[in-house]
């Protein structure tokens, strides 16, 4: 992909753990590579299809100096986060933040941290069977947007019977396709935080829930940890999930089963 490179932008700020760093300040140096398609900007001379690097450098300087953080990791992360928010056309970003005056009391050229993030497509299943179910789904989607997660597509809302053997009210279910620069684990933590904010209490396994947010796919990632399994292990067993998925992404291929969603849906429906 095409790349814009910004190298060694110098800024003065008051980041650091030591009191002297927060009182006296020091020099920091930022370099970054931003990846996006430059075709429209190059052929149509359209600045809106590009990143105005002069404005971006000014924004970085403003953002960098408006707070005093203990860790350069925090500052670098915030620069990446706000750049993605301000420039939706950027698909990937690698940013290095150097701290050449780091107080280590040894001969040193610089210390630096590098944060590398790439936008990914993910699918999230939403469900609710308590209160105003459709309103709960809408609130969850609004909270995703508020966190900078771009909603690409929304399936229709389905009324479905509960899954898992616990007697309870029917569900309103939906699947959304999103674009996010958050890694899978961070995206999961975001979903759990939204559930908590909306009042979900985990008492009965597969029991009634005000809101349920399940991470189904993140691109073609296959992942198994104590906290997260990708793809979601029950996708091929849940007709309501497949029905919603095939509505918005029928040709998406399950990375383990190697079948498009529409085939999995047709097979389970039979």
Swiss-Prot record:
InterPro entries from the UniProt entry: Dihydroneopterin_aldolase, FolB_dom, GTP-CH-I_C/QueF, Hppk, Hppk_sf
SMART domains hit by this protein: FolB
Pathway: Cofactor biosynthesis; tetrahydrofolate biosynthesis; 2-amino-4-hydroxy-6-hydroxymethyl-7,8-dihydropteridine diphosphate from 7,8-dihydroneopterin triphosphate: step 3/4; Cofactor biosynthesis; tetrahydrofolate biosynthesis; 2-amino-4-hydroxy-6-hydroxymethyl-7,8-dihydropteridine diphosphate from 7,8-dihydroneopterin triphosphate: step 4/4
Record-listed Mg(2+) 1 binding positions: 212, 214
Catalytic activity: 7,8-dihydroneopterin = 6-hydroxymethyl-7,8-dihydropterin + glycolaldehyde; 6-hydroxymethyl-7,8-dihydropterin + ATP = (7,8-dihydropterin-6-yl)methyl diphosphate + AMP + H(+)
GO biological-process terms attached to the record: folic acid biosynthetic process; tetrahydrofolate biosynthetic process
Assembly mode: Homooctamer.
NCBIfam families tied to this protein: folB, folB_dom, folK
Similarity comment: family membership: In the N-terminal section; belongs to the DHNA family. In the C-terminal section; belongs to the HPPK family.
Record's protein name: Bifunctional folate synthesis protein
Source organism of the structure: Streptococcus pneumoniae (strain ATCC BAA-255 / R6)
Gene designation per UniProt: sulD
């Amino acid at each position: 992909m095409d790349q814009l490179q910004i190298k060694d932008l110098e800024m003065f700020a008051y980041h650091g753990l030591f009191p002297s760093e927060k009182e006296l300040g020091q020099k920091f140096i930022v370099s970054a590579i931003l990846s996006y398609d430059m075709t429209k900007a190059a052929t149509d001379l359209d600045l809106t299809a590009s990143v105005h690097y002069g404005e971006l450098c000014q924004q970085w300087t403003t953002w960098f100096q408006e707070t005093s953080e203990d860790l350069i990791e925090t500052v670098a992360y915030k620069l990446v986060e706000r750049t993605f928010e301000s420039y939706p056309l950027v698909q990937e970003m690698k940013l290095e933040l150097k701290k050449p005056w780091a107080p280590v009391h040894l001969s040193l050229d610089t210390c630096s941290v590098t944060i590398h993030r790439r936008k990914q497509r993910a699918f999230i299943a939403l469900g609710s069977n308590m209160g105003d179910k459709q309103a709960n789904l809408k609130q969850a989607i609004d909270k995703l947007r508020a966190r900078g997660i771009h909603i690409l597509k929304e399936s229709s809302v389905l009324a479905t019977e509960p899954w898992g053997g616990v007697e309870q009210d029917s569900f309103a279910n939906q699947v959304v396709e999103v674009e996010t620069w958050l890694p899978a684990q961070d995206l999961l933590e975001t979903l759990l935080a939204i559930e908590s904010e909306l009042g979900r209490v985990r008492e009965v396994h597969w029991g009634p829930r005000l809101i349920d947010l399940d991470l189904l796919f993140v691109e073609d990632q296959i992942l198994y940890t104590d906290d997260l399994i990708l793809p979601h292990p029950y996708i091929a067993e849940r007709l309501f999930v497949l029905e919603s998925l095939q509505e918005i992404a029928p040709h998406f291929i399950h990375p383990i089963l190697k079948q498009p969603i529409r085939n999995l849906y047709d097979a389970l429906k039979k």
